[in-house]
Structures are given as structure tokens and as C-alpha cells.
Amino acid sequence: MLNIQAGATRARSKVVVKGCILGPSGIGKTSQLWTLDPATTLFVDMEAGDLAVSKWTGDRIDVFKEAQRMELPVWEFAVNLACWLGGPSPLSMTETQTYSASHYKYVCELFGDPKALDKYETIFIDSITVASRASLSWCKVQPAAISEKTGKPDTRGAYGLLKQEMVSWLTQLQHVDKNIWMVGILDKTTDDFNRTVWSPQIEGSGTVNALPGIFDQIISMVELTDGDGGKCRAFVCHTLNQWGFPAKDRSRCLDLIEPPNLGTLMEKIAAGDPGVPSLNLSMPAGSAAHKVTS
């Protein structure tokens, strides 16, 4: 029998958030760990750049060292970890596919009993930038990235496989019943019209384009100018912002600018009750929409 979740039950269910914090190098993304409870947070370190949080007392997985110890490519380790965190995926149509029940069984034998994860409420992954590089390196040596005609590397094939791998990995993590937060580098470039463009430093445009559909929250951690002309760090949380930073707030509980504190941000989302849709769906009086005639 199909289980239809009642509205009252759904309203009482635990709030878990999937989010990504993007920011320039050195802005303090990894240091957001200090705002999280070390007793219930697992730090997945792909960067080997944890100097800023070396005294943080929570649990940590050193992805590079563990992959090296298990004699696995870094990307294969990351995929196995996502499977271990999320369990078998109903999106896997055969037992030979990644994230299938067979894959999950193999991963549990490799990593151990997944009950070890029960104590964690939040998984903090540093970073999606490095994950995409590891994925691309792996994709470049797969058969799909080698031309059948010439036997030479096929760049288009490699990037096509990269999109599949990254989106599948992120989707697997999306369905983990825990808070999932990733951090990544935010690049600043200038286009042909001398306009500033902010974009995630992630290999493959397909992955970048898929992010808003996967994550609940996309936060840009950036430097802004305060009312006194001084510089300050801030979280930019709304898609419509005057600076063009990538951002999204599915919770509808956040202001345009929030203090740069992930722990406080999560508490606000968990406690917030947006009620009826808070989006402003009306058009400005002087907009082009009001001038259209039949």
C-alpha cells in the first residue's frame, strides 16, 4: 500500500538542509566548522587544507589519505563515501550501477557498519571544487573519454561523463537524511563588456548549472562594505541581489544578507516558519508587463 504522508506529520518532521557555501579563497569558508557542534558534525576533508580548523575537535575523514590507504582513486573513494552515507538509491536501475544495493553492500564491507554515522546530524564537505577536479581526472581515463576511431583522448566525452558523475554524486548526497553542507571557491571574472561575473570554481558547466536544482541553499560568503565604509564578511542568500552573487534560499526564512555564521543560519532555518509563500509575485507598476496590449 502506498504511504501518503499527512500534512501534519510532514510539518513535524525533522528539518534537514542541503546547502553550498561559495566564496573567494581565504574568506573563511572552512572556518565555518567552528560554528557547528563538533559532537554531531562529520568533516569530510578533500582539500588537505585544514590549518584553520586544526584545533576543531570534531571527527574528520581525510579523503586523500584514506583513498591512498585503500588504494582507490580519490573520486572512487568519494563515490563510495556518498553511497555509504545515503544507502542504496532507487535511481539505480541495475545491480551493476553505482549507488545500487550491490554497491552499498560492497561499501559497507569496505567502510564498516553505517550505524557509525548515526551520531552525526551534519556532514561538512570541503570542497566541491576539489571533488570536481578529482572527478574530471577519473573521467579522463575512462573508455567514454577515449575516441573509438583514433584512440586519442576525447575531451567532449570526458566532460559529458563528468556531468553524469558529479550530478549523480550530488543527487546521492541530496537524499542523505542529514544536513549536507559543501563549500567551494567563487571566482570573479570580467566579461567582454567589462562587467563583473561571479561563478563557482567547479569543473564542467553542466555541474554548475545543476547546482540550484539540487541544493536547498546556495550562499555566497563575500566581502561587503558596511555603512561606515569598512569591509566585512557576509552571507548573501537571495537569488535577486544587486551584486550578481550566486545565491538561493529555498527555506524562505533568510534575509538578503545574513551574518557569516553557518550554525546560526541553520538554527534560523530550522526555527523559521515562512507559512504562506513570501515571494513577491506582483509586477512593478512601471514595468513592461503593464504596457503590453492585446
Regions found by a protein language model. Name each.
Residues 1-3, 13, 17, 228-294:
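C-terminal regions of RecA-like/P-loop NTPase motor modules
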Residues 2, 14-106, 116-122, 129-134:
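Conserved P-loop
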Residues 2-9, 108-111:
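A short, compositionally biased domain-edge/stem linker segment
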Residues 4, 26-29, 165-166, 204:
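Amphipathic coiled-coil/heptad-repeat helices and related helical stalk/stem segments
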Residues 10-13, 179:
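Glycine-rich phosphate-binding loop of ATP-dependent small-molecule kinases
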Residues 11-12, 32-35, 113-116, 172-174, ...:
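A general structural signal for short secondary-structure junctions and capping/turn motifs
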Residues 118-210:
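P-loop NTPase motor core
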Residues 178-259:
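Phosphate-binding/switch region of NTP-binding enzymes
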